[in-house]
A protein has these predicted regions:
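Substrate-binding surface in catalytic domains of secreted glycosidases
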Residues: 91-98, 173-296
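Acidic/aromatic/glycine-rich contiguous surface patches that form carbohydrate-binding/processing clefts
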Residues: 335-373
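Glycan-binding loop/region signatures in secreted carbohydrate-active enzymes
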Residues: 117-132, 267-335, 364-373
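Active-site groove signature of glycoside hydrolases
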Residues: 83, 144-175, 221-235, 348
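Glycan-recognition patch characteristic of GH18 chitinases/ENGases
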Residues: 49-148
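Hydrophobic faces of well-ordered beta-strands that scaffold small-molecule active sites
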Residues: 57-63, 80-84, 114-118, 161-163, ...
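Primarily a LysM-type cell-wall glycan-binding module
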Residues: 1-21
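Short, acidic/polar
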Residues: 63-77, 138-154, 204-213, 327-340
Length: 373
């Protein structure tokens, strides 16, 4: 694959001619909805043979069953695990799994082991430290939780669980450790896989409840959720800045065996209104939608080399100014390079509901997804 960055004066037709491709194929390969327009700064994927050997890795693809099928079906061919988002828990230890029967069946048909992603999400969809605290501390509630979890896994065709416990109280660190040990014992005894999510340590109080070494002791693979610096509640910045991701990896490999680490890779973009004020929420969209928005708005794209992320500014229909950060092909290739450089076990894609042909093509060119079922 070749990466071509569009310049002022380029058109899709001129770029296609340069690389001897039909313009329709180039547009399809890059998920461009308007093949008649192009803006400067876009990283375009150009099909070409790669001289690099493919390495087998573990790929955990996360998908929201409510949005299936979209592109999740295609992603399963390139995935080891298909993590179904998300099963909520209650303060009584009950589980509220998603209606994902079709997703689970499709995953199995493509050789992707379906996992149930269980998160401490409250009824409003936000992470709740109080909810997690109750499950971690009340023995009866926790007994109910694990009885429910095993029953759901066994009756709905899952191959295991992905525990996504986030924004916990720092003082629940030891309780989380005991919970993970119990989860590992119960699931492994029954032949289930266990993945666990661990936030970046530099995320302050958010990460203090998590012991990387203990995650490694309990889980088959540990997912580093390195895709939340630029988020809906914060100020404009890259979603997954390369320098910050590298710092997280430098610490993580000291406590987690490299082959157990799955690097979180974001497939979403954030758009903030300007001027930004504390309390404003950004809107989320797919990276592909961000590219097409830049084209529609006629906005030049600027690539931040240090962050390996792209941004542009545009005005919406009401004339409001926005700044949008997204991941392009250069971003994905830089993350894939980290997987190789650090000798990681693989990566976790958050999420695969929105189509992203350049991402899938680059992954297929460099890696082979291990198949465990």
């Amino acid at each position: 694959m070749i990466v071509y960055v569009s310049r002022r004066g380029d058109t899709l037709l001129s770029v296609a001619r340069r690389f001897h491709l039909p313009p329709e194929e180039l547009a399809r390969y890059n998920a461009l909805t308007d093949p008649t327009r192009l803006v400067p700064g876009l990283a375009l994927a150009i099909p070409a043979p790669s001289g690099e050997g493919r390495r087998e890795i573990v790929v955990a693809a996360c998908a929201d069953a409510a949005l299936f099928p979209l592109s999740a079906g295609e992603a399963m061919r390139y995935a080891t695990f298909l993590c179904s988002l998300s099963c909520r828990m209650t303060g009584e230890g009950l589980l509220l799994p998603p209606a994902d029967g079709e997703l689970v069946r499709a995953a199995r048909a493509d050789g992707a082991a379906p996992l149930l992603c269980v998160a401490n999400l409250a009824g409003n969809g936000a992470f709740s430290a109080d909810l997690a605290h109750r499950v971690l501390t009340d023995g009866c509630v926790q007994d109910t939780f694990f009885a429910q979890l095993l029953s759901v896994l066994e009756t709905r065709g899952y191959c295991g669980a992905y525990l996504y416990l986030m924004y916990l109280y720092p003082f629940d660190r030891e309780r989380l450790g005991a919970f993970l040990r119990r989860a590992a014992a119960l699931l492994h005894e029954r032949g289930f896989f266990l993945l666990s999510a661990a936030p970046p340590r530099e995320s302050g109080a958010v990460g203090k409840a998590h012991d990387y070494a203990l995650h490694a002791e309990c889980a088959d693979w540990v997912v580093l959720t390195t895709y939340d610096w630029g988020n809906a509640a914060g100020e404009p910045q890259p979603v997954s800045p390369l320098g910050a991701v590298r710092r997280v990896l430098d610490r993580a490999v000291e406590q987690i065996p490299r082959e157990k680490i799955l690097l979180g890779v974001s497939n979403h973009a954030c758009s903030w209104t300007l001027p930004w004020r504390l309390g404003q929420e950004a809107s989320l969209m797919s990276n592909t939608a961000a590219v097409n928005l830049a084209v529609a708005a006629g906005a030049a794209v600027h690539f931040d080399e240090g962050a390996a992320a792209s941004r542009f500014r545009y005005r919406d229909d009401a004339g409001v100014l926005h700044e949008l950060w997204f991941e392009d092909l250069r971003s994905f290739l830089s993350r894939f390079a980290l997987v190789r450089e650090y000798g990681l076990g693989g990566m976790s894609l958050w999420t695969v509901n929105a189509p992203n042909p350049p991402l899938m093509s680059a992954q297929e060119e460099l890696f082979t997804a291990a198949k465990l079922i």
